[in-house]
Amino acid sequence: MRIVALSDQHGFLPDIPPCDLLIVAGDVCPDRFGPFMAVHDPYQQQAWFDRTVRPWLAATSARHKLLTWGNHDWCGQMCSFRSDTPAHAQSTDLQILVDEGTTVASARGAGRELSVWATPWSNPFMRWAFMKRPSDLERVYAAIPAAIDILVSHQPPLYYGDRTFDLDAGRVDHVGSRELLDAIERVRPRIVICGHVHGGFGRYEHQGIPIYNVSVVDEAYRLVNAPTVIELPDV
């Protein structure tokens, strides 16, 4: 199965190469829609999503399209904007997942279905959407079922794709989630897809499990990375 994954678009809608499964791992929405619009206006975001993102998704060749939210996606948290409507699902084949799973058919219809679980949360930082304390995240991640194929999380696990530079302290910090790392060790998915930390883009590995940070923008919110293409063998 060919997977194309991206996160942290912040309003950018890059070209999507041909694939079987498209995964959007949060922060799809921009924060502001003009000089007189309030930052983090969830209803403006929802209108923008319906007007802009849905046609972009409908234009891709992906047979399956999955999305979870990120900390900039206020529409996902404030508007109860969770499951897709039948009319929109018919035109985009989109599933929006919030701490829930789904299955997708293998690329050629042979072999078993692939299981996917997606979660939008991040560690607390300033006042953003979809944030929980580590003690709460431990309970959230405990619901992830064992032996899934693909785990999608907006935030990265601790030590993998999570490095940031603290200008004030003059040091590199790891800001990923220890609780997510513990869940990965318990669940042992075939692959992990995440984002959130723009400078963490790339492929990593923990205990033989590939971890992809698929952010497409850099720390200055410039579009610098292409969507990540992952070939996952059918089983």
What are these regions (language model features)?
Residues 6-107:
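Core catalytic region of metal-dependent phosphoesterases/phosphodiesterases
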Residues 29, 33-49, 147-188:
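Active-site-proximal segments of metal-dependent phosphoesterases and phosphodiesterases across multiple
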Residues 57, 141-144, 184:
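Short hydrophobic patches on amphipathic alpha-helices
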Residues 1-3:
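Extreme N-terminal starter segment of soluble prokaryotic enzymes
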Residues 102-110, 179-187, 191, 198-235:
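Binuclear metal-dependent phosphoesterase catalytic core
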